[in-house]
């Protein structure tokens, strides 16, 4: 198939949508498809309509001189209407505010082009205005296939529609490595320590605190400061814990102040995937304090390494974690603090979650999940 992937942001910008679109393009190319990424994100000083190769994927940049190099091009609409019909299918990737994606949607509606739209963001409280700016019901009636990266995100999109629409789930996927190697190593250690029942179970105690990890941007929406506060509450309840935070961002100074006041955190900074996988191999638990996370790539990577996950109700993490089997779902920060304290003092419960996470590989990988995308593309073409 000739496939166009349309996204406002793309490399060299760094973020969730950028990473997913790039990895999707590479996976489709490896499967033998002709892939073009069309983006409004500039690379270097060049502006206008130009192309470059990213491996076997063609990247077409329709860029304009916009302050702060924002991925916005008010002049791209005519080009998209002219050229998108050349593709067998168009896959448009959208956040909450994605003007370039909207131009592509309008082009596909006007030219009756087979297209899928995927929302990578949880609309949260934006639904009240989103419905006035985006005629979702008209898009669906024109033949567009509407999807989101999780059930939680999909329900929010449906809620934002002026009329009834059906939004499917097209989940994010990750590469197998380095996460699978980390899982195998952790599973071997788990068995040798008696985690499979061959020896007395591991117990956290004074010699080894419960090792908790999280990886995120240190920004208010990611709620790392509340994580520091709730883990401090867990420690006050007798939990022997140590939380390693991977990432960087504007909340760093606030976190450093909380650490000086006794919060059981260490800031590890931003590291690459290999370093993160190595850290996960020796950890016990991943915690995600984000409220209404659209998906949770960092949590998926941790789960791929065999870590159970504690997460908030309403999060897209529910797509790949089963409450009580390989993680715990909580409704508040107080419940999260209680769950952390419980796992630190009840090693058998932690062992149960850990064993399930280690012994059951995830299916949300490009090698195991790409057919979900291809099946949807074929359906859209009919």
Locate predicted features.
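Conserved donor-binding/catalytic core segment of Leloir-type glycosyltransferases
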Residues: 189-193, 201-232, 244
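Carbohydrate-associated surface elements
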Residues: 152, 173
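Nucleotide-activated donor-binding/catalytic signature segment of Leloir-type glycosyltransferases, i.e.
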Residues: 253-271
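Short hydrophobic beta-strand element within catalytic cores of glycosyltransferases
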Residues: 308-311
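A short, well-ordered alpha-helix in the C-terminal region of glycosyltransferases
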Residues: 349-363
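Conserved acidic donor-binding segment of nucleotide-sugar-dependent glycosyltransferases
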Residues: 323-334, 342-347
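Aromatic "clamp/platform" in nucleotide-sugar-dependent glycosyltransferases that forms part
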Residues: 291
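Short alpha-helical donor nucleotide-sugar binding micro-motif in glycosyltransferases
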Residues: 270-271, 278-283
């Amino acid at each position: 198939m000739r496939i166009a992937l349309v996204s406002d942001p793309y490399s060299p910008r760094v973020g969730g949508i950028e990473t997913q679109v790039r990895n999707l393009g590479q996976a489709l190319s490896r499967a033998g498809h002709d892939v073009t990424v069309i983006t409004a994100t500039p690379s270097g000083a060049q502006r206008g309509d130009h192309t470059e190769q990213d491996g076997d994927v063609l990247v077409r940049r329709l860029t304009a001189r916009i302050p702060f190099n924002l991925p916005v091009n008010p002049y791209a609409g005519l080009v998209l209407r002219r050229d998108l019909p050349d593709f067998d299918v168009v896959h448009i990737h959208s956040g909450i505010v994605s003007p370039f994606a909207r131009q592509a949607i309008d082009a596909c509606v006007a030219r009756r082009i087979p297209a899928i739209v995927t929302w990578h963001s949880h609309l949260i409280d934006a639904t009240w205005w989103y419905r006035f700016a985006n005629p979702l019901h008209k898009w669906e009636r024109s033949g567009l296939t509407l999807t989101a990266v999780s059930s939680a995100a999909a329900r929010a999109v449906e809620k934002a529609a002026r009329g009834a629409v059906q939004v499917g789930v097209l989940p994010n996927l990750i590469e197998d490595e380095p996460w699978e190697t980390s899982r195998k190593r952790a599973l071997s250690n788990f068995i040798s320590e008696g985690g499979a029942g061959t020896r007395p179970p591991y117990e956290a105690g004074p010699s080894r605190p419960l090792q908790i990890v999280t990886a995120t941007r240190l920004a208010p929406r990611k709620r790392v400061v509340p994580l520091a506060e709730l883990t401090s509450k867990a420690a006050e309840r007798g939990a022997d814990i140590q939380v390693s935070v991977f990432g960087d961002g504007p909340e760093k100074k606030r976190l450093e102040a909380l650490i000086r006041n006794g919060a059981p955190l260490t800031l590890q900074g931003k590291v690459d995937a290999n370093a993160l996988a190595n850290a996960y191999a020796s950890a016990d638990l991943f915690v995600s304090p984000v409220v209404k996370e659209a998906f949770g790539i960092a949590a998926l990577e941790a789960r791929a390494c065999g870590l159970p996950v504690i997460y908030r109700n309403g999060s897209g993490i529910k797509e790949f974690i089963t409450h009580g089997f390989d993680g715990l779902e909580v409704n508040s920060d107080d419940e999260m603090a209680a769950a952390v304290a419980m796992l630190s003092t009840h090693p058998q419960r932690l062992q149960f979650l850990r064993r399930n996470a280690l012994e059951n590989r995830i299916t949300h990988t490009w090698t195991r999940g790409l057919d979900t995308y291809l099946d949807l593309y074929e359906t859209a073409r009919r």
